Amino acid sequence: MTSSGHPQMSSAGLPHEALATAGRGRTPAGHNGGMTDIAAVRSMLREFPLVDGHNDLPWRLHALSQADAESTDLTVADIGAGTLGTATQTHTDLPRLLDGGIGAQFWSVFVPAHLSGDDAVSMTLEQIDRVRALVEMFPDRLELADTAADVRRIHASGRIASLMGAEGGHSINNSLATLRILRELGVRYMTLTHNSNVDWADSATDDENIGGLSRFGTEVVAEMNRIGMLVDLSHVSAGTMRDALAASRAPVVFTHSGARSVTDHPRNVPDDVLDRLASNGGVCMATFVPSFVNQGAADHRFEREDAARAAGLEPTSDGWHPFLDRYMEEHPPPVATMDDVVAHIEHLREVAGIDHIGLGGDYDGTPTLPEGLEDVTGYPRLLAALADRGWSRDDLEKLAGANILRVLEAADTVADVLSDEPGRRWRIEQLDS
């Protein structure tokens, strides 16, 4: 309460405690008794942008078009006029983004880790072009953003702010010059690895090679700090996480990861790393991938991948994904739920702190999703579930977007401070034997 006796108000003009109290004693999901929370969440998201850290729609459109001789990447799915509640080829379209309250989206310009050298660079450029083309196709609903101020302005105009993130250091082909060019083209973060090691950093899902970052990898992080590109530590090994935290002068991000103490999967973040986010200022954005949020689903994933390897296949083999699909048909995996995601978010909050968490669903980057979060319309349900557990409006605003917007601003401040430093000219062979 304020000194005048009125309830303490948030910046959006609603009582901070409204969301935390409205849902207590709710009837089960699907009944009208739960709509008070949903309505309050939707009201909040109209005034405050929800920023999702990772969506793979650009690659999904590319993959769909490769299998359809009559369509292009921009025509293969009806992104602009998708119908809510019907089965579509993607988890994401513009009507569902609107229904999900997304105010800003980091579109992944992912390319597969089996691409290397110039092939990886050129495909990354095609992905950047695909995002730009999507935005140009729907100027009344999308606009490219680069800064936190851009996000707030675009959201206030009723459109979705569109940012880009590269997923894997293979996209720069060991070239600091290519890194700088990606930043010039609007890429705001780079995940240091994807599922495989790069020459200068270890991945969470590959055999240990370096033990973390090499000397050149440390220079990559330093150059990212200098140019204002966020260092994304999703997908990297625990050693790489720790080395990057030690090297980075700007806050780091995990754009789509969970808590390893909740689900023991190498893609998730150990508690000692989460504990260091407060001093670094960074953010861990909770993912929704079933095998990262549910232990039974994680164990099933290990089992089917072991079975594929026993059959003589590797992730780069043409038969890898068909084998996994057949295995899942014959041995259905456990079903993850929104409650699993809530458990991760609450653990991230407990260890890293309320100022160091966010959301990164990984929609269109995984074939299945938890019950209740099947597509991008699920965010209001998730936030309402947290409100039902006592989260205040301030808490939800931080999770939804305030924390990652603060990190963007901090990265830009660091880049301003470092702007007088010359760009690094090192070649990898000069630093790494």
Please tell me what each predicted stretch does:
Residues 2-3, 10:
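Alpha-helix boundary/capping motif
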Residues 6-7, 14:
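Compositionally biased, intrinsically disordered low-complexity segments enriched in Pro/Arg/Gln/His
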Residues 19, 24, 28-210, 260, ...:
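N-terminal hydrophobic targeting/anchoring segments and the immediately downstream early-domain regions
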Residues 211-219:
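Active-site glycine-rich loop that binds ribose-phosphate moieties when present
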Residues 220-233, 239-240, 271-279, 347:
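Substrate-binding cleft of carbohydrate-active enzyme catalytic domains
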Residues 227, 234-239, 287, 396, ...:
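Glycoside hydrolase catalytic-domain context in secreted enzymes
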Residues 244-249:
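Short, surface-exposed basic-aromatic patches at helix termini and helix-loop junctions that form
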Residues 251-257:
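Short hydrophobic/aromatic-enriched beta-strand-loop microsegments
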